[in-house]
Every structure is written in structure tokens, then in C-alpha cells.
Amino acid sequence: MAHFQQTMNNKVIEAGMGRNSLINDLAQRRVYDNAVEELNHRSRRPKVNFSKVISQEQIIQATNAYPEFEITFYNTQLAVHSMAGGLRALELEYLMMQIPFGSITYDIGGNFSAHLYKGRDYVHCCMPNLDIRDVARHINQQDTVSTYLARLERSKRGLPVFQQSAFNKYMNDPDAVCCDKRFQDCSYSVDLPGKTYAVALHSIYDIPADEFGAALLRKDVHICYAAFHFSENLLLETTSAPLDEIGATFYKSGDRLSFFFQNESTLNYEHSYKNVIKYVCKTFFPASNRFVYHKEFMCTRVNTWFCKFTKVDTYFLFRGVYTRGEDSEQFYTAMDEAWEYKKTLAMLKCERTIFRDRAAVNFWFPKVKDMVIVPLFDGSVTSGKMKRSEVMVNKDFVYTVLNHIRTYQDKALTYKNVLSFVESIRSRVIINGVSARSEWDVDKSVLQALSMTFLLQTKLAEAKDQVVLKKFQKFDDTVTNLFWKQISDAVGDLFPSIKETLISGGFVKVAEQSLQIKTPDEYITFADKLVMEYKATEELQHLDISKPLERAEKYYNALSELSVLKECDEFDITQFKNLCEEKDIDPDVVAKVIVAIMKNELTLPFKNPTPEALSDALSPLPKDLDMRFDLLKLSTCAPFPSVKTLDSGLLPKQSYGDERQFESQSVVSVSDFHLKSVESVKMKSMSSAVYTGPLKVQQMKNYMDYLSASISATVSNLCKVLKDVYGADPESAEKSGVYDVVKGKWLLKPKGKCHAWGVAELNNGEKVIVLLEWADGFPICGDWRRVAVSSDSLIYSDMGKLQTLLSCLKDGEPVPSDAKVTLVDGVPGCGKTKEILETVNFDEDLILVPGKEACKMIIKRANKSGHVRATKDNVRTVDSFLMHLKPKTYNKLFIDEGLMLHTGCVNFLIALSHCREAMVFGDTEQIPFINRVANFPYPKHFATLVYDHREVRRLSLRCPADVTHFMNSKYDGKVLCTNDVIRSVDAEVVRGKGVFNPKSKPLKGKIITFTQSDKAELKERGYEEVSTFGEINTVHEIQGETFEDVSVVRLTPTPLELISKSSPHVLVALTRHTKSFKYYSVVLDPLVKVCSDLSKVSDFILDMYKVDAGILXQLQVGSIFKGENLFVPCPKSGYISDMQFYYDTLLPGNSTILNEYDAVTMNLRENNLNVKDCTIDFSKSVSVPRQQQEFFTPVIRTAAERPRSRGLLENLVAMIKRNFNSPDLTGILDIEDTAELVVNKFWDAYIIDELSGGNVTPMTSDAFHRWMAKQEKSTIGQLADFDFVDLPAIDQYKHMIKAQPKQKLDLSPQDEYAALQTIVYHSKQINAIFGPLFSELTRQLLERIDSSKFLFYTRKTPEQIEEFFSDLDSTVPMEVLELDISKYDKSQNEFHCAVEYLIWEKLGLNGFLEEVWKQGHRKTSLKDYTAGIKTCLWYQRKSGDVTTFIGNTVIIAACLASMIPMDKVIKAAFCGDDSMLYIPKGLDLPDIQSGANLMWNFEAKLYRKRYGYFCGRYIIHHDRGAIVYYDPVKLISKLGCKHIKSLDHLEEFRISLCDVSASLNNCAYYGQLNDAIAEVHKTAVNGSFAFCSIVKYLSDKNLFRTLFYNGSSTKG
């Protein structure tokens, strides 16, 4: 999770800084989806609670060891051996996971309470009391169950449903849950279908291994899963074996094996060593003369070994595996019974068919690697005897000592000198003033004894040398005799004792007449044999899967039945299956019923299974349905006459404004709610309801339910506050408040005052709704106990509206209006309010607005002329109109910001106003109606307003030009503006919300927030008191209003869904101002990025949105040179300061880096380096002093560094960066099959069909001559002395570094020490063999590639690149893809090698040479002779290999071909790790980044751009072709280099730069070049002036010299 969170944070930061703008949204979404998918998968794992207190390291250890579980670490229980005790729960759950749920299971020595808690009523625990400790533990288990039940009883909770069956079984039949018998003697049995299983958690130690198989067979156990502690060291000749991960130790004494925990006082456990070893080493556990249990190890986790014992029937074995053999006992019996018969008859009778099987288990001992067993001698002064023991010591340490002391003279070869040397190399050493730890960690307590052994070994070795020498001179005696003679001369009188000790101790093997040093085996094999007699043959029964298949067949037939329906792909299959299973219904029957309904063959006919159609189907039938049918049958005229004649009726009144009479008496007062029980108000369920009638009626019903749900939710929350009030701080102002009537004080003080209503708790505990009156800030209460209020009960809003709507129903149904409804859809600031004021007739029309602020604003604007036209009667808020309905009719109804309202509310407003026409003004892209009641259903089709006519307004009178540019990305149609302000948007990211203070951080204009919490916090800080507009509002509250200046503030650092580029809240916030908008945020978020992007839009573009701008005519120029670049000479102008300014603008801060002494600082300071296994020669840590080279100093300041000196630390840092710590991102991959598939795709994508065949003759003399012509004479001279009889070691490479650091074109040099580039290369002799070979293979590959579509950039000039891209059609919509891969070389592994080898094979690589090449690139050794570093690498790409460049190019091409449909690609270019693809715009692509991670092990980032960037060059395509510009930023960076040695070197440098940047002389396409640079560098400005300056200085030799000066003189 840390990885996903860090990735998402990086994406947000990049968005704010303007990086990766083209793919940032896609990348963020992908990271989010991956995180959600992984977290959802993790959440489905079984959950285990780990309550013991353990360390953070142990938490990580347990989590990594058991990834199958979601472990929650509470750290709430201190206990002995917490780690091991807590792991027992995990181990038990892991064992039970292996068993099919519900299968009969025996837990051998188990804990019955653990199974009760999990609700496993199918487990029987055998819990024998083998000692007093067992009795105590079983009592403790019973106590835990009692404690658990008491805790439930105290909290008045019942048992969870899943535990009830297990606890009931224990209550009714406890012997079925557990018994006190040994597993071998357990009498419990159950006769149920299915297989039987067993688990043994740390309990098989006490079951004799010879009885285990029979005991399992007695219970007919199918598989037994077991777990036990063990250490491989117990198989060695050692008395103790520590288990470090759980802090325990095994101690062996004879056959007694003790187990105890370290560093604590606990009971010990004792077992039989021989019995434990049998379980470890045996494979077969015979159960009878037919059945045997076969043991297999499963895994080892945290010092616990898991295995399973599977029952095997030997009768299932193939008959041919048995052999004939004689049974000796049967032979003698037959001879006794039939002595008179011949011996042959007796032999035939005793012959039996025997099966023999053998299994071997290898045990690996990691601690004995590179160790030898050295004998130690200890003499006794008292007895005069000598004891011998053994110790394991590092092999390298032993032979280092022996080799060194062999160089001593005879006089110096003493015990003291040997001990002194051993002690010195064991201790820490000082190298160049630095303390370095010895690489050998040998126990100091054995150094003296080891020194004596080394002395004896050296004496013996010298004597052996003399014996061998004399043997060639004396042939009358054996080597052994001469050897003993020399020993006798050396030790004198001690010879007999020494001789006896040497022979008995193993130094001298008399039988073999040789000396031997013992080396322990890393692996020890234990074999187990099984012999069974053949008696019968049976067939292995197949698994019965008929029932699941029958069920699957039924669902398949049912879904086949349903497939005939239209839009069947939207059918919810999961819900269909759940319905059939819950109701136990045949799926086929259900499917036929559904099909019949959908085909109108049954009732409930509707076309589509949508809520709207279902509502129509459930609507009541018209009352005159029968009469309609009669008319259709009998009438001879048209069924629907155009003129309808009425017998009688009433004409409408000609005037408006008179009172009208409601069918009901009057609007019911909210007083009906007073003292109403809360239970009568609460909604029991908010599940999706089915509404009937037309869509308008359904919307109105849904709105009434919404009001009821809102009141219900508020009442429910107030009841909860009354229940939870105790323990709260009475002085803390909260959203809710509780007043104690008896005590006369606030138990919980609310923020608001004078609430309209609340919930009161009566003395009998009943809760009722009360309408409140206040006096002196306290509610006037009746005979109540407590009263609860909240911010939702400040006014009667929802109560009043609901009562009004209920009073207007007719027969319980809302009656919609038939007035004409017109929707005016306008952009922000289009003059909707102005249009209302210009159209409305205040005498007979009504204006309704959602909020009070808007209502005041309309009244103020309508009456600004001095004549009062607008009043509180004809301009009202929606809430006021619905709560205080007046019996009056209106001609026209104007609803401002009507789309912010519930559509049912709009329908009610139109109906209750009795208007003839309704004008609903709104914005489909701004904030819609927000459903603020959780879980209340507001279907999507209800959110669409039903209207008769729609008018569109796309001219904004309010918004400045830059905001208009943003709105054009939101609305259909072109949005224009009349505002003269061009730029108005700005953003500022502050360090934190503590910065905001009215005095130090004043905010201009109207202050707006996104959330209520931010609004409240700004109020607390005093901003409302100093604001010119007084009140601070949220974005939602001021929709529809206009201000000159706006300040939007975000104080919440956590992610907000309201703030996204597509959020309507962002659109509303950006469109409230006429002059200026400034956004203050504590985090980088999408709105900051929007502001940043708007600030970069050119004034020319913004002027086009103004309607009063003049008409701009574009000059059309026809083609002059079709297919060629238009050439406009670049003016040679500008100064050095122009280049410096451009560099500082694109890479701010890089020119201020003082890096001259970075290398010196790194060598002097302490460094912590993460180094893999390698050998370092510290004698090379201090380089030989050399005279420092003088270099020219550049005038232009860049991040370039001086060349560095090679040395141990510098080379090691480079090796770590380039070769160590390679990524490991690959998932599970079939290397061979996947590689073959990738190569086939590579071949199909890039190779011309006519040339797709192989070539078997790449090695020719012509190929060798072509290669040799490219080599230097010195290389050929080195090869002249090589005999080529055998190759040097092909798996050995040399390592060196480049002295000049690579310049980076980002801001990383400011805080990162750049590692040097490395060169890993073969010897010249190997290159002489494989250089011509791969050069020829490369030539053949490039000849076969479709060069019209794909460019493999090898030895191509800029002109050739331009020619390749010149046929791009600029009229075709396309985009550029770039796959940026970091750590490219060291990310390549075995899979990449397999892909590359298959490609070379297709081209005809020789089989023998291919195998040699493979071995040289599998496990390779690197040696850096300059720095004294040796290490080993696997499969990485070597930077100095003969196939480095073409291999990298092929791999990146194969990578993209495996993920992207290359047949859809327009153009593609590959070079090393660089790639660029032109694809059609909108092409649907797979998740390339994920594929690069999981298949190719690449840390990749995908960029979508308009212009390509390839090998440091910008590819600018246009209607005439394409032009390639060398990166100007890279050029300027090179002009700041610090490695120029002389004027001649400077001139060579200028010429090389002129060659690569020749295209900059053409300024015709500088505009496109600037756009391309802006895609890469977000701070880029128009750099044409800098480009001209570059051309000026490169084209003049003398002028170029002024860019550098040598330190000893002035410029020049």
C-alpha cells in the first residue's frame, strides 16, 4: 500500500507542477484502479486477529509468512513467547484452509474453544491429559469459553449466527466436540457422507511414528495436515539448535529432546529425539498390509514445518511394478508341511508378489555453506588424557591462516606467533584511518584451541613435504614410515601420544595411508523404503462431479433461454443465481417466466427491464379502458377525432391574481408534528421503491419521499445524540446539542441558537418530536427529561414543505401541471438573471430562486431604478413558496437555477403556481441537485427534467477570456464572451492552513470555500469580519451570483471529490468573477493545474473568444515545394545572456549548483551504500595522486560537472546505480512459451513477408572483412598474437567508468549526486569472434525490416530521419506515444535473453556459438581492476557488449510489439531504450504500463504527446513533411561543459555541435519547436531568441571561443 500511496502522491504533485499533463489523468486513474483492485482482493482474504504484543519486525515477519490472511495486529496482550503463541492461531487457520469446509475433521491434541469461536461444528478434538500441564491447559480453554459467554451476556448480546450451531453441539453432546482420549484410542465416530480429514498442530511429537499410520486408518482419514517445530541442525552432530525467528531452542541429550523459549521463564517440553527424527525423515507410514500414508512437505514458515499425510491404497498400483520374491518364513513352513515333495513345490508355495518403493528427502543446511569441521584438542593436567571435539569454522578463514603460517621460518613457527596472527585477522583493522570490520566472525572462545590445531596442521604439512621429497631419494621404505619418522623427530617424546591422537581424531587415516580434512555436506539425503505384498488389484475411482455439472447445466440452459431477449448483456446474472438459490427455484422455470413477461405473453408487459418501464407496467389501468375498446370495435370513423365536443364546462378567468380555493381546507400547519412519536416518522427502509404513473408524477412522489427521508434521518440522528451524550465535553460547540431539563444546563452545547424543533425524551423514556420556543437562549420545556437539537433542526424547512405537498394531493396522488415548460440552458454569466428581469411582469408573474442571497440580489437589481417593482411576494425562495403557500395564480413562472432543484420539486412549483408557462433557467454543466440523504434512491432518469422546449445561451457576459477558454472544453457548441479582461485566473499553493490570517494574509473580494468545514474555519479566523462582502459562502451557496473579485480557499489537505477537472463545483467556482480569481490551496490539486494551464494559453487564442474582436483573415499560401521543408534562414542575433535566460527558465535552479567539489565531499564524508554481494580491495580506496588536469571554464552556467577521477568509491557508486538493485516486477511467466509468442509477434510486425525466412550462413569471409574494416589498427594488433585455440572465459567481464557524468535535463542535479556511466566489456579476443557474427546478423535483420514504416536508428543521419518522417499526413488525427523506461539495462533478465536468442536463431545463428554466447550472459563475473571490486551479475545487459545497442533496440521493439497492435501504427522508431510511435488518435490500447511491469520487468512511464522526442531530437511534422531539431536545451547544457582541455579541443567540440544542430539554421518551424518543448518542459517560453543566439555562436569560430575562458587568462 505504501507503493500505491506514494505513486498517487507523485501524480498529484506532477499535475500541480505541470508535468506529464497528457497522461496524468490516465495514470492517476490507472493507479487508483490498481489500488482498488488489490485492496478488494486483499479484503476478501480470511481475517485473523493477532492480539499479542510483538515488535514491528515480527509484525512484518508474520505478515510476509502468511499472505493468505488479512491479519489485524491489536498489540493488546502481553504474554510469554508472544510471537509463537500468536502464530498458533495463524497456523491452525492455515491447516483448516486446506480442508474442504464442512468435512469431518479430527484435531489431534487440538483446542476445542478455537473451533467454537469459528463456528466449526464438524471438528472433533482429541485432547488427552498426558501430564498435569495438559489438564491445566484444558481447564484454561473452558475458562475462555465461559469468559466469552459472560461478556456477551453483560453486553446483552446473543451469540453470532455462525457460532450457534457449534455451541449448541457442545451443549447437547460435548463428547462429540472433544474427548480426553489419545487419538490412537479415540472412540468417537460419525457416519456421514464425504471424506474425513485430520489436523495435528504441534502434537505429533508424542504419537509414536510406528502407530501413526494405523491410527489414521482407524478413523479412515483421507489426508492429515500437520505442523511442527524443527531445525535442520538437529540432523547434525550438535546438542542444541536455536529457532531464532520465534526465540526458541531445541536441546538434545541422548534420546531426550527438550524444547524451550529463550529469554523467559517458561515450562520446557520434552520429546523422544528418535521419534521426532522418524517424522522428519520417513516418507512412508504403513497403516495395514494394504494402506500406507505418504508424507509430503508443504512449506516452512517461521520455524514451523507443514506437511501432509495422504492415504494411499497400494491396490491401485499398476500391476507391473510388483516383482516375484520368496518369503523365508513361508519357505520353512512349506518345507515342514511337504517335506516329501520336491523342493520346487515348496519354492512355488512360498513365492509372493512383492512391491518395493523408495523415497529420498534432501535436507539443506544453509549454515554449513563454506564451512569446514576443525578438530580441537583439550588436555587434562590431572589425568594426563586428551579430549577431542569439533567446531565448524569458515573455510576461507582456515586456509587463509594455514597458507600464511606456512610461510613462517622454523624458528618463527611457534604457538604464540600463530595465536597472534589468528587474533589479528579476527579483530577489526584500520585501513587508511578508517576502521573496517573483519569479514570472519569466529567465536573468540575457540581461538586458542584453533591456534594449536593450526600449528599441528602446519607441522604435519611440513613433515609431509619432507616425506615426499625423501621418497624420491629412498625407495626402501614406505611413505607412511618416513612420515612417522619425521613426526617423531619433530615432537620427540610426545610422539606416541600425538600419533594416537592424530589417528583417532581423523587427521591421519591409517587405513588409507593419507591425510584428510573433513568438509560437512550441505545436503544430507535420508531414504525410506516400503515393502508391501500384492494381494489384489482395484481401479482408482474417478471424482464424482455430476451434481455441480447438473447445476451448471441448468444455469446454462436458463441463460440460453434468456439470451433471446434484447439488451440481454445488461442482465444481472449474479442476482438471478442468488434468487434461484435463496428461493430454491428451478432456474429454467424462472427464465421461462421472465422471457414470457418480456415478450408480453404474461402480465407486467414492458419493453426494457428499467425502473421507468416497471413503473409504467405497475400503473393502474384507465377507468374507461372498456369503453375505448368498444369505440375501436364499433366506430367507422377515425379512432382519435381531432375536435372534442363537451356538453358543459367553465371558462377560465381573463385576469390573474384572484384567490382560488383548494380542494382541501387549507395548508396544514407543522404543529401536527408536535409531540409526535419518533417511531411514526422514521422510515423503516430506504430501499429502491417502484413508483407508478407518468415520469412527472414519479419525480414528484420521489421528492415527497426525499423530504420524509430527510426528516427521518434528522430524527434518527437526534435520538442517537440523546443516547450517546454522556461523556461528551459540555463546553465544546458541536453540530448537535442536548439540553438537560432537570438540571437546566446544556449537556452538549450546539453551535446554532434558537432551533425550531428537536427531539425530546420524556420521563418514561419515550422520544417525541417537539416544536420549540426560546427564552434567554434556553428552550422552554414541558415535563421532559432532555431535548436534542442539531443544525438540521434550525428551521421547519422540510417539515413545512412536506405538510404543504401532502395537503395538495388528490386521492393520495400528486397532480402535475400541463403548463408549457421551457428550459433555458445557459453558460455561467450568460445573463439568465438579466433576461428574467427584462422579461418578467411583476404584476402577474412569479420569480423563484433556490437561495436567500440570490433572492436579495434579484430584488436589489429590479428596484435599483428607485421604482419598487420586486417584492417578497413576487420574488421568493423555493422554500418560502412551498412552506407558506398563498392561494394565488400566476401567468408565468420564472425559476432561476432550477437545475439545482429536485426535478419533483420543480414539477410541484409549476403545479402549485397554476401558471400558464414556466421558464426554468439553469446550467446542465454546473452543480445539479445533490442528494444529501445517504442511501436514499434517486434514480438517474429522475434527474432529467421533463420540458417541452429547450433554448441555449452560449455567450457569457460575465466571464473573462481565459475562463471562457476553459468553458469551451465543457459545453457543446462554441462559448464566447464580451468581457474585456483577458487574464484573470491565478493560484497559490500555501505551506499550510496556519498561514491564513486576516492581517498577514488578506483575501481580496468575495471569499468562497468548497466545504462547510473550511467555511467555518475561516469564520473562526475572523475573515468574515474583514470581508467586504461580509458572509463567507460555499460554492454551492453562491451558484448564479456574480462578483468582481473572488478568492477561493481550500484548507482541507485530504483528497476531495468536489475538486476535479470534471467537477461542476470547479466550474461554478471559476465562473463567479468578472475581474480576478485567485485560488489558495494547501495541496497541489486539479484546480491548481487548471489555473496553471490557463495561464499558459496565448493571448492570440484568448482574443478569439471575444465577440467584439475583429475578424481575422488567414493568409492561404499554396505549396511551393511539395514534400520538402520550407527554408527560412535563421537570423544570427542574440547574446550569451539569452541562452542563459532560456536555460534558467526551463531548468530553474540548475545554474546555481556549486558542484565543483561534490566528488571530494563524497570521498570525505560518511556514506551509507546498499551493496549486494561483492569483494572489495580496500587497498584501492586511496588513489594514486596525479597532477590535476586544467579545463576551460564556461561562461554559461549549467549543471554540468567536471570530469571525475576513477576510484573505489566513485566506481562503487556507479556500479550500484547501473548494475546493482535491479527491479523485480515480473509476475508468473512461462519464459520459453512467452518468448516464442513475443518473437512471432515481432516477426509479424516488423519483418517484410517476402524476407521472413531464415539465413543459415551469417559467418562468411566477407562478413569478417566488413567487421575488420571498422576496427582500429591497435585492436587488430592485439589479435595478431592470439592463437585462437581456445577462448578466454566468456562469462568474465571487465568494468570501468566514464569520467564525464551524463547531463540530465531535469531538476534532479539540484539534490542528487549523479552516478557515472559504466562500461562492462569483453576481451578483444571474444569480440573478434562474435563481433563479425552479430554485425552480419544485424545487417540481415535491418535489411528485412519494413523501413517504410519502422525506423531502427542505427548509423542514421538527421537527414535520413527527416526523410523517414516526411510522408506523415498532417491531416490525419494522430498522437505520439513514448515509452520511457528507467533502469533499462539492469532490468533485463532471463526472459529478455530468451527473446533475443530466438530472434538471432531465426536469422541463422550457429548453434554452438549461440550456446557459448548464452553461457557468457547467464551468470557473469565483473572485475574492476582500477577500483578493486569483484562481483557477480545475472542476465543483465552489458553496456560494452557487441550486441548492446542492437540488442536494446530489438528488445524495446519486441516489448511494444507484444502490447500494441503494430498494424494500426502509422510510424515507429526505435533506438536503444528510446522509442516513439505515431498512432491514430483515439486508438484503444491495453494497459501498456502494467504489461511492461509484469511481463518485461520494466519501470515504464507512457507519454502521449503531439510532437515526438527521439534520441535527443524533436520530430516536427507538418504539411510539407518533417524536420528534426536537435534539443536546444541539450545544446545549451553542452555549451556549459567543463571538460574542454585546449583550443584545438574546443574547435573540435564546436564542429561536432554544428553537425548535430544544422537544422537550427532553418527558423521556419520555430513555432512548432516551441510547442514541442512546452510539452516536455512546463515552464518553457518562446525560445526563438535563444535559438538564434545558438546559431550565431556556433557559426563563428572566434565568437564561439568567447563562451569559454581558461582560468589563467581572460576570455579568449
Swiss-Prot record:
Domain Alphavirus-like MT stretches: 72-280
Span list, region Helicase: 822-1080
Stretches assigned to the (+)RNA virus helicase ATP-binding domain: 794-953
SUPFAM superfamilies for this protein: DNA/RNA polymerases, P-loop containing nucleoside triphosphate hydrolases
Protein name: Replicase large subunit
Signal peptide (UniProt feature, chain positions): none
GO biological process, one term: symbiont-mediated suppression of host innate immune response
Organism ancestry: Viruses, Riboviria, Orthornavirae, Kitrinoviricota, Alsuviricetes
Recorded catalytic activity of this chain's protein: RNA(n) + a ribonucleoside 5'-triphosphate = RNA(n+1) + diphosphate; ATP + H2O = ADP + phosphate + H(+)
Keywords: ATP-binding, Helicase, Host-virus interaction, Hydrolase, Inhibition of host innate immune response by virus, Nucleotide-binding, Nucleotidyltransferase, RNA suppression of termination, RNA-directed RNA polymerase, Suppressor of RNA silencing, Transferase, Viral immunoevasion, Viral RNA replication
Membrane among keywords: no
Listed InterPro entries: (+)RNA_virus_helicase_core_dom, Alphavirus-like_MT_dom, DNA/RNA_pol_sf, P-loop_NTPase, RNA-dep_RNA_pol_alsuvir, RNA-dir_pol_PSvirus, ToMV_Hel_N, Virgaviridae_RdRp
GO molecular function: ATP binding; ATP hydrolysis activity; mRNA methyltransferase activity; RNA binding; RNA helicase activity; RNA-directed RNA polymerase activity
Binding site for ATP: 826-833
Key word Hydrolase present: yes
Subunit structure comment from the entry: Heterodimer of a large and a small subunit.
Family listed: Belongs to the ssRNA positive-strand viruses RNA-directed RNA polymerase family.
Highest taxon above the source species: Viruses
(+)RNA virus helicase C-terminal domain residues: 954-1112
Domain RdRp catalytic: start-end pairs: 1374-1487
Additional information: This protein is translated as a fusion protein by episodic readthrough of a termination codon. When readthrough of the terminator codon TGA occurs between the codons for Leu-1112 and Gln-1114, this results in the addition of the RdRp region to the replicase.
Region (Methyltransferase): 50-452
Assigned EC number: 2.1.1.-, 2.7.7.-, 2.7.7.48, 3.6.4.13
